[in-house]
C-alpha cells in the first residue's frame, strides 16, 4: 500500500534477505494494527510528511473536548507507538495525545544519520521540531522514555517556548560513565547480552543476523514484555511487534550507537547540559524502583536547577519500563502533572 515504507530492492542480496529475515514493513503494520485495535478512544493513525521527504508515523488520540495543551509521548530505544497501548486511553481522556515513531524507528522513515554524536542527536531533535511545525502544535507537555527522555531534554534546550512541562521517564544518557566499576548498577541480563555482542556492530544486530531465529530471541531475552502486556495480549503480539520494529534497516539504531558510550551511557551526557534548559520550564523525573538506570540523576538535576521546578519520584514495583510495569499508577501520575499545566 502507499502508506507502507517498504525498503527498496538493492539487488540479489535484498531479495534474498526477506527469506532469511522474516520481517517487512507490512508485517510491522499488521502487528501494530492488532495492538491499536485495543484502543477504546477514537484515534487517527497516519504518516506526517516532513519537508525533507521523511515521514513520521503518528498516532493521535483525542477526546471530544480537546482545548487543553496536548501531551506528546516519545518512545525509547527499539520501541514504537504500540508500546504506549496501556497508557493512551487513560492519558487522552481530557486532552489530545500524540505519539509517533522516532525517525529511524518503527514505521517512520529510516534515513542515513550523521555518524557523529552531536550530528545524530541534532537530526533526531530537528525531526521532532519539524514534525511539531507540520502538525501545527503551538506548545506541548513533552514526555520521553529512556532514549526518548534524552531527546526530549535536548529538544527542550533548543525549543523551550514549545514545552509547557518536561516529563522524563527513566531517561537514558544523563550521568557521566563512572570510572569506578563498583559505582555501576548491575544491568539486566538482556543489557549484558547486548553489550557482549556490541563491538563494531549495532546494538540489536543479532536480531537481524539470527534470521528466522530472530523472533525467538526476543521471546528468550525479553519474556518480561509478554507479562507486562498480558492484560491485553495472551499471545506473542508484543514480542512480534518488538521484533519487527528492530529487524528492519537499523537507521535509528545506528544513530543511537553513534550517541552512546557502551550501552548505558551517552557520549554527550545530558547532566552536563541540562542547566541550559530555560529556568521557567518545569521538569518531572519518574523512575521505576527496580530500574537499572541511575536514579540519583533526579537529585543531581535538582542541584543544577535550584531556581527551577524539578520533581523526581519513584514508582514502586516498576523497572525501566515504568509505563508498562505499573500503568495505572503511571497514568495517574502523568494525568496529575498534565492537570497542573491546564
From Swiss-Prot:
Its EC number is 3.1.1.-. Keywords: Hydrolase, Lipid degradation, Lipid metabolism. PANTHER family: (LYSO)-N-ACYLPHOSPHATIDYLETHANOLAMINE LIPASE, RE40534P-RELATED. Lysophospholipase selective for N-acyl phosphatidylethanolamine (NAPE). Contributes to the biosynthesis of N-acyl ethanolamines, including the endocannabinoid anandamide by hydrolyzing the sn-1 and sn-2 acyl chains from N-acyl phosphatidylethanolamine (NAPE) generating glycerophospho-N-acyl ethanolamine (GP-NAE), an intermediate for N-acyl ethanolamine biosynthesis. Hydrolyzes substrates bearing saturated, monounsaturated, polyunsaturated N-acyl chains. It comes from the Eukaryota. It catalyses: N-hexadecanoyl-1,2-di-(9Z-octadecenoyl)-sn-glycero-3-phosphoethanolamine + H2O = N-hexadecanoyl-1-(9Z-octadecenoyl)-sn-glycero-3-phosphoethanolamine + (9Z)-octadecenoate + H(+); an N-acyl-1,2-diacyl-sn-glycero-3-phosphoethanolamine + H2O = N,1-diacyl-sn-glycero-3-phosphoethanolamine + a fatty acid + H(+); N-hexadecanoyl-1-(9Z-octadecenoyl)-sn-glycero-3-phosphoethanolamine + H2O = N-hexadecanoyl-sn-glycero-3-phosphoethanolamine + (9Z)-octadecenoate + H(+); N-octadecanoyl-1-(9Z-octadecenoyl)-sn-glycero-3-phosphoethanolamine + H2O = N-octadecanoyl-sn-glycero-3-phospho-ethanolamine + (9Z)-octadecenoate + H(+). One of its GO terms (cellular component) is endoplasmic reticulum membrane. Disulfide bonds: none annotated. This is (Lyso)-N-acylphosphatidylethanolamine lipase. It comes from Homo sapiens (Human). Residues 70-201 form the AB hydrolase-1 domain. Belongs to the peptidase S33 family. ABHD4/ABHD5 subfamily. GO terms for molecular function: carboxylic ester hydrolase activity; hydrolase activity; lysophosphatidic acid acyltransferase activity; lysophospholipase activity.
Amino acid at each position: 500500500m502507499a502508506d507502507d515504507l517498504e525498503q527498496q530492492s538493492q539487488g540479489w542480496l535484498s531479495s534474498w534477505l526477506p527469506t532469511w529475515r522474516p520481517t517487512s514493513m507490512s508485517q510491522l503494520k499488521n502487528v501494530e494494527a492488532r495492538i491499536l485495535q485495543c484502543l477504546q478512544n477514537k484515534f487517527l493513525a497516519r504518516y506526517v510528511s516532513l519537508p525533507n521527504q521523511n515521514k513520521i508515523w503518528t498516532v493521535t488520540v483525542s477526546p471530544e473536548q480537546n482545548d487543553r495543551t496536548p501531551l506528546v509521548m516519545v518512545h525509547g530505544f527499539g520501541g514504537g507507538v504500540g508500546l504506549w497501548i496501556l497508557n493512551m486511553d487513560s492519558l487522552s481522556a481530557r486532552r489530545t495525545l500524540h505519539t509517533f515513531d522516532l525517525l529511524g524507528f518503527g514505521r517512520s522513515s529510516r534515513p542515513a544519520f550523521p555518524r557523529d554524536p552531536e550530528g545524530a542527536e541534532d537530526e533526531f531533535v530537528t525531526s521532532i521540531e519539524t514534525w511539531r511545525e507540520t502538525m501545527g502544535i503551538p506548545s506541548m507537555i513533552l514526555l520521553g522514555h529512556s532514549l526518548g527522555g534524552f531527546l526530549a531534554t535536548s529538544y527542550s534546550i533548543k525549543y523551550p517556548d514549545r514545552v509547557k512541562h518536561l516529563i522524563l521517564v527513566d531517561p537514558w544518557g544523563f550521568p557521566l560513565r563512572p570510572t569506578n566499576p563498583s559505582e555501576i548498577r548491575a544491568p539486566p541480563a538482556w543489557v549484558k547480552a547486548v553489550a557482549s555482542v556490541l563491538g563494531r556492530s549495532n546494538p540489536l544486530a543479532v536480531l537481524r543476523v539470527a534470521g528466522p531465529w530472530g523472533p525467538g530471541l526476543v521471546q528468550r531475552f525479553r519474556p518480561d514484555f509478554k507479562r507486562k502486556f498480558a492484560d491485553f495480549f495472551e499471545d506473542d503480539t508484543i514480542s512480534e511487534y518488538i521484533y519487527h520494529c528492530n529487524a528492519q534497516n537499523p537507521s535509528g539504531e545506528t544513530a543511537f550507537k553513534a550517541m552512546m558510550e557502551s550501552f548505558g551511557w551517552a557520549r554527550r551526557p545530558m547532566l552536563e547540559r541540562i542547566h541550559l534548559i530555560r529556568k521557567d520550564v518545569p521538569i518531572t523525573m519518574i523512575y521505576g524502583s527496580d530500574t537499572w538506570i541511575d536514579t540519583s540523576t533526579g537529585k543531581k538535576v535538582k542541584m543544577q536547577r535550584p531556581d527551577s521546578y524539578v520533581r523526581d519520584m519513584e514508582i514502586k514495583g516498576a523497572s525501566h519500563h515504568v509505563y508498562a510495569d505499573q500503568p495505572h499508577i503511571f497514568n495517574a501520575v502523568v494525568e496529575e502533572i498534565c492537570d497542573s499545566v491546564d
